[in-house]
A protein has these predicted regions:
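A short, charge-rich alpha-helical start-of-domain segment used by transcription regulators
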Residues: 25-27
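Short, small-residue-biased leader/transition segments that mark boundaries at the very start
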Residues: 1-7
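N-terminal glycine-rich anion-binding loops that anchor highly charged ligand groups
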Residues: 30
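Charged phosphate-binding loop/patch that engages nucleotide di/tri-phosphates or the phosphate backbone
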Residues: 173-199
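Divalent metal-dependent catalytic cores for phosphoryl transfer on phosphate-bearing substrates
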Residues: 17-22, 44-166
């Protein structure tokens, strides 16, 4: 192991300690679950394991704040509260997280920040790292069993595109059944992966 690995390990430990204080225990357990799952998937798909772990750790770093505090952070970071964020305030944490990860947790890697920025809604043409964090968030071991989760967990280590498409389809169906607002990015992303030709 080189000196770089030691520094990386120390950086990660500092992030973990800070998150443990900032998040509720259940949210912190989920965070670790996403980080571990993302790093395992990264090994399978040849993606940088350190980046996957850090993105998994930081994806929900804004969840420790109340909705009111999240609104204030949106204003601070000039994030528009128009449109879906008005109807689906639970998406605010996704918008805030990249800024918070950079400012409070000193994460400067653009690929990590980009993966954090679309971990809930997805986006058209995601990179493998972005897909890995998106998938890991949905199916990490601490998640309660929901219809279709076993299929997702199998696909997660076989085909990122098929797995992404399945999650988006499940999410849209669930939100429709519950009568909840569906972010247009989620719909657009689903259509993209539904229509994407297999390589």
């Amino acid at each position: 192991r080189g000196l770089g690995d030691v520094y990386k390990r120390q950086e990660v430990q500092q992030i973990e300690e800070k998150l443990k204080t900032a998040l509720k225990p259940s949210r912190y357990r989920h965070t670790l679950g996403v980080a571990y799952t993302a790093s395992c998937m990264a090994m399978v798909f040849g993606v940088d394991v350190h980046k996957a772990y850090r993105a998994g750790l930081l994806h929900d770093c804004a969840k420790g704040f109340s909705m009111e505090e999240q609104r204030a952070l949106c204003k601070q970071y000039n994030i528009s509260l128009e449109g879906t964020l008005t109807k689906s305030p639970q998406l605010m944490h996704q918008e805030i997280a990249p800024f918070l990860a950079s400012d409070e947790y000193k994460e400067q890697d653009s690929e990590v920040l980009s993966a954090i920025a679309c971990h809930t809604t997805g986006k058209i043409g995601m990179t493998p790292l972005e897909q890995i964090v998106f998938i890991a968030d949905y199916m990490e071991p601490n998640r309660k069993m929901i219809p279709g989760l076993s299929k997702v967990r199998k696909l997660a280590f076989e085909d990122l595109d098929k797995c992404t498409k399945t999650i988006l389809k499940n999410t849209i169906e669930y939100l429709t059944e519950c009568g909840q607002e569906i972010d247009e990015r989620t719909v657009e992303t689903y259509k993209y992966y539904r229509d994407k030709k297999e390589n």
